Amino acid sequence: SVATVPVSGKLPNLDTYPEIKPQYVTPEMKDNYTPYKRNPENQVRYWAIPGQEGYTHILGGLEKDSNTGAISTDPENHNLMCHLRAEKVAKIAVPDVEVQGCADDADLLIVGFGGTYGHLYSAMEEMNKAGQKVALAHFSYINPLPKNTAEVLKKYKKVVVAEQNLGQFAGYLRMKVPGLNISQFNQVKGQPFVTRELIDAFTKLLEE
């Protein structure tokens, strides 16, 4: 199945990643500490180390007041919290999506995400060997999308989004990138893509 296909990969070198510096509470906050106060630049809350006097707070799964952290059933507060969480996610830094294959002059860009990578890459590779100019942009991050998403998707003459569902990612991309003109290749068979079927479908798109 897609979930159990073995794929070789290199272990990341953690030394190449930027240092993560948590936002801890400061001594000045002690007398007026509110556990849900956020840094307005990134909507991240300040960390209080458990056991420190003056920084007692409770964690839980119910909706909280946007300031005090107390359980809240207020509709306006819930609406605000949903927007704050969405804004926080939108500000997460993710790497640009990379384009493989004929990145500079492809006549068709294949777009995929998740466990379909191997089959899509094989289809692209075989088509390029046959003289067809094809590229692949495989997304590892979809919320938020990489900052270069619109630039990549609008660069090529034809774009096809291949997914093992009814086109949810294609619809999401249309919503996030207005004016996007893309084709779809969708299957819901409970089985991995077949490379030959992908090549046939993509070749047909190139011939249109």
Residue ranges and their predicted role:
Residues 1-208:
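Flexible, low-complexity linker and terminal segments
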